[in-house]
């Protein structure tokens, strides 16, 4: 098991039971951020219609900033980043209704 903190900010918490922060013990099969995204879809997004708010074309939807330990995930090899104990993964929506 690996302990990670996952944050859903900028209104994204509505797709994960309106909880902004999750401290998770993820199974050892969850090796990288891509695996973590799959884990989130399977275990945290209860209404499967909300998956399209989070994912588009097998990646995080444009308009969602993804940070790994406060660093843009594009600098950390995106979905291939290997998760380590204590990592903080943040998803922040920049899109808001008006």
Curated annotation (Swiss-Prot):
Write out the GO MF terms.
protein homodimerization activity; protein tag activity; sulfur carrier activity
Metabolic or biological pathway: tRNA modification; 5-methoxycarbonylmethyl-2-thiouridine-tRNA biosynthesis
Q: Where is this cross-link: Glycyl lysine isopeptide (Gly-Lys) (interchain with K-? in acceptor proteins)?
A: 98
* Any GO CC annotation of this UniProt entry: cytosol
Give the record's keywords alphabetically: Cytoplasm, Isopeptide bond, tRNA processing, Ubl conjugation pathway
Intrachain S-S bonds:
none
Lineage, top-rank taxon, reads Eukaryota
Q: Which Pfam families match?
A: Urm1
| InterPro entries named among the record's database cross-references | Beta-grasp_dom_sf, Mopterin_synth/thiamin_S_b, Urm1
Q: What is its main location?
A: cytoplasm
Name the GO terms of the biological process aspect: cell budding; cellular response to oxidative stress; invasive growth in response to glucose limitation; protein urmylation; tRNA wobble position uridine thiolation
- Location of 1-thioglycine modifications: 98
Q: Where does this one sit in the cell?
A: Cytoplasm
Which protein family is it in?
A: Belongs to the URM1 family.
What's this chain's function? Acts as a sulfur carrier required for 2-thiolation of mcm(5)S(2)U at tRNA wobble positions of cytosolic tRNA(Lys), tRNA(Glu) and tRNA(Gln). Serves as sulfur donor in tRNA 2-thiolation reaction by being thiocarboxylated (-COSH) at its C-terminus by the MOCS3 homolog UBA4. The sulfur is then transferred to tRNA to form 2-thiolation of mcm(5)S(2)U. Prior mcm(5) tRNA modification by the elongator complex is required for 2-thiolation. Also acts as a ubiquitin-like protein (UBL) that is covalently conjugated via an isopeptide bond to lysine residues of target proteins such as AHP1.
- What is the name of the protein in this document? Ubiquitin-related modifier 1
Q: Tell me the organism.
A: Candida glabrata (strain ATCC 2001 / BCRC 20586 / JCM 3761 / NBRC 0622 / NRRL Y-65 / CBS 138) (Yeast)
- The gene it comes from is URM1
């Amino acid at each position: 098991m690996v302990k990670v903190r996952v944050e859903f900010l900028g209104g994204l918490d509505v797709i994960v039971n309106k909880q902004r922060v999750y401290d998770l013990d993820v199974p050892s099969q969850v090796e990288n951020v891509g695996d973590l995204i799959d884990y989130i879809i399977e275990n945290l997004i209860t209404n499967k219609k909300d998956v399209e708010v989070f994912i588009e074309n097998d990646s995080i939807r444009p308009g969602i900033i993804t940070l790994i330990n406060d660093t843009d995930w594009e600098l950390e090899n995106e979905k291939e980043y290997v998760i380590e104990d204590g990592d903080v993964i943040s998803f922040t929506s920049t899109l808001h209704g008006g």
